[in-house]
């Protein structure tokens, strides 16, 4: 029987698992075996780990566990988009969304219950911040989704190669600001990249940040994955209003951080995300200003039609205005995409992953709550 003080092995990346096995008097190769069982074979207990010595299995049964977050709900859209509501305890919940496409499958992962950044156009921020997720709760979203999706396709667990992988891309674009939970997010991403776990390339793991400049630099030094920046405004005055974090890290500092990051990034551009708000940030003049502020950063733009929520006081830009805005950027030679709406019928949105605005992220209030999901593309 597992003790009350057992460690959750999902909290360990490769280095952590080697250290843990060392504390049990085991050699490093045992950690690799254990990691493969957990992350490639979806093992939930130790008895079935047949290539581990029985003595080690007995040690683990007394000291360790493999504990996944509980799934509160699981919905599939008519277009194949799938959304899970994950119970993370104390009445809090986060959402994980899978977006299937012909050549890839993208998983949108949450890093916090709620968010402290409080962007004006994001309903998650309006609910306040509850807590950081643990590494186990973050990597558990990928583990849960990958093996649930494999089961739905009749595929068995196991390291069957990239052709058998269902989740081919991960975007840290769910609830929360990933760089404000750095100590848990980075080990989770290391597992995403580890060949003894999920084996994704750095180009296929994208972290989206609102612009936490010091942590962007740290990420670049320690684990440079693809980077997206939630920009949403072309000048400091407007961005101060839409993204309050800009008051601490204004655009000049943010653009400089992007330039530094590109020196080590797995891609040669930054993706700038831009929520299209009617009459707020969507004129052709704004587009030209946006080109000016980003001129020294190789980039692409991802324009996001706003998903309205109660009390936001904001309206989605009209399609024709989004098109005009995009054309200014395209005419300047910058790759520009407009994010598509996906899975309307299962209610989960970029910027609205918390569902209908409630008090914080209360699970009982949120199961089945309303929202919209829009396509999340790895970049």
From Swiss-Prot:
Biological process (GO), any one: rRNA base methylation
Q: What is the reaction catalyzed?
A: adenosine(2503) in 23S rRNA + 2 reduced [2Fe-2S]-[ferredoxin] + 2 S-adenosyl-L-methionine = 2-methyladenosine(2503) in 23S rRNA + 5'-deoxyadenosine + L-methionine + 2 oxidized [2Fe-2S]-[ferredoxin] + S-adenosyl-L-homocysteine; adenosine(37) in tRNA + 2 reduced [2Fe-2S]-[ferredoxin] + 2 S-adenosyl-L-methionine = 2-methyladenosine(37) in tRNA + 5'-deoxyadenosine + L-methionine + 2 oxidized [2Fe-2S]-[ferredoxin] + S-adenosyl-L-homocysteine
- Which cysteines pair up through disulfides? They are 108-350
Q: Taking the first listed entry, what is the main subcellular location of this protein, grouped into a coarse class?
A: cytoplasm
Highest taxon above the source species = Bacteria
Catalytic positions are: 95, 350
Question: Where along the chain is [4Fe-4S] cluster bound?
Answer: 115, 119, 122
Could you tell me which InterPro entries the record lists for this protein? Aldolase_TIM, Methyltransferase_A, RlmN_N, RNA_MTrfase_RlmN, rRNA_lsu_MTrfase_RlmN/Cfr, rSAM
**Cofactor binding note:** Binds 1 [4Fe-4S] cluster. The cluster is coordinated with 3 cysteines and an exchangeable S-adenosyl-L-methionine.
Q: Give its E.C. classification number.
A: 2.1.1.192
Which residues make up the binding site for S-adenosyl-L-methionine? Answer: 176-177, 208, 230-232, 307
Cross-referenced SUPFAM superfamilies, in alphabetical order? Radical SAM enzymes
The record's keywords, sorted A to Z, are: 4Fe-4S, Cytoplasm, Disulfide bond, Iron, Iron-sulfur, Metal-binding, Methyltransferase, rRNA processing, S-adenosyl-L-methionine, Transferase, tRNA processing
Gene Ontology annotations for the cellular component aspect, listed alphabetically: cytoplasm
Spell out the protein name for this chain: Dual-specificity RNA methyltransferase RlmN
Q: Which PROSITE patterns match?
A: RADICAL_SAM (PS51918)
* Gene3D superfamilies referenced in this protein's UniProt entry, alphabetically: 1.10.150.530, Aldolase class I (3.20.20.70)
Q: Specify the species.
A: Burkholderia cenocepacia (strain ATCC BAA-245 / DSM 16553 / LMG 16656 / NCTC 13227 / J2315 / CF5610) (Burkholderia cepacia (strain J2315))
Q: Name one GO molecular function term.
A: metal ion binding
Q: Pfam families in the record, alphabetically?
A: Radical_SAM (PF04055), RlmN_N (PF21016)
Annotated function: Specifically methylates position 2 of adenine 2503 in 23S rRNA and position 2 of adenine 37 in tRNAs. m2A2503 modification seems to play a crucial role in the proofreading step occurring at the peptidyl transferase center and thus would serve to optimize ribosomal fidelity.
* Family membership noted in the UniProt record: Belongs to the radical SAM superfamily. RlmN family.
Other information: Reaction proceeds by a ping-pong mechanism involving intermediate methylation of a conserved cysteine residue.
What residues does the Radical SAM core domain cover? 101-345
